[in-house]
Amino acid sequence: MDLKNSSALPHITVATVVEKASKFLLVKEKANGQIVYNQPAGHLKSGESLTAAALRETFEETTWRIKITSLLGIYNYLSAANGVTYIRHCFIAEPIWQEPEAKLDSDILDAVWLSIDEIIQKTAELRSPLVLTVLKDYVAGNSYPL
């Protein structure tokens, strides 16, 4: 088996939970032909640290500069859509400033701020169950030092 290119290997991803005025920063994106909501998230690049990836992905998908304050958790998710296992490292971050002139990634339709209630109402439109899982952990006060 060629492990280097095997779909049996988990994909390492990062995500951020960013809260401002009781609203959470989410991205509205097109994935697999559907419009869905997700935390700013993405894959780790070769040689990149987890926190650097989280900073980069959040900026590329939202145009927000953030400060990572802690680790929320590490989550394992098996996608029924493609059979891939994702290991998501989710960080808690504070918004610092937005660069409105910056362009969003091409697959991102918009960056939005939604309350937890608004997110729950969009459960069917969430990219994966992890979106709500990590928010529930955040609201419960989970946090680990970097």
Where on the chain are the PLM-derived regions?
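Acidic, metal-coordinating catalytic segment for phosphate/diphosphate chemistry
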Residues: 1-15
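Short, solvent-exposed loop/turn elements at beta->coil junctions and helix N-caps
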Residues: 4, 72-80
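Residue-level preference for beta-strand/loop junctions
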Residues: 8-10, 35, 85-87
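Nudix hydrolase/Nudix homology domain
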Residues: 34-37, 106-146
